[in-house]
């Protein structure tokens, strides 16, 4: 039987995002998109207030865990070009 130390993930490894009651269904596409928006809104708000963006790291970890890399890259390119359809 494995000990408690052997069951812990190594440092720096991602864990599964916790359950979000806003998205109870198996399809997590909307959850991915919403956490991407929440992260960018959080960073924008914290920068505007001159505070640390550390509280925004939760949203970053969740959307990086749920979203395909190609989606995130496309959304970031759209943000840079000013063509992103979401409200940030």
Curated annotation (Swiss-Prot):
InterPro entries registered for this protein in UniProt: COX6B-like, CX6/COA6-like_sf, Cyt_c_oxidase_su6B
Positions of disulphide bridges: 32-67, 42-56
Entry GO terms, CC: mitochondrial crista; mitochondrion; respiratory chain complex IV
Pathway the protein takes part in: Energy metabolism; oxidative phosphorylation
Chain spans, region Disordered: 1-26
PROSITE patterns membership: CHCH
Keywords: Disulfide bond, Membrane, Mitochondrion, Mitochondrion inner membrane
Organism domain of life: Eukaryota
Bilayer disposition of the protein: Peripheral membrane protein
Main location: mitochondrion
Keyword Disulfide bond carried by entry: yes
Localization (cell): Mitochondrion inner membrane
Residues annotated as domain CHCH: 29-75
Expression across tissues: Testis specific.
The keyword Disulfide bond is annotated on this UniProt entry: yes
Sequence motif: Cx9C motif, positions: 32-42
Matches recorded under CDD domains: Cyt_c_Oxidase_VIb
Entry's family note: Belongs to the cytochrome c oxidase subunit 6B family.
Function: Component of the cytochrome c oxidase, the last enzyme in the mitochondrial electron transport chain which drives oxidative phosphorylation. The respiratory chain contains 3 multisubunit complexes succinate dehydrogenase (complex II, CII), ubiquinol-cytochrome c oxidoreductase (cytochrome b-c1 complex, complex III, CIII) and cytochrome c oxidase (complex IV, CIV), that cooperate to transfer electrons derived from NADH and succinate to molecular oxygen, creating an electrochemical gradient over the inner membrane that drives transmembrane transport and the ATP synthase.
UniProt protein name: Cytochrome c oxidase subunit 6B2
Species this protein is from: Mus musculus
Lineage, uppermost ranks: Eukaryota, Metazoa, Chordata, Craniata, Vertebrata
Gene that specifies this protein: Cox6b2
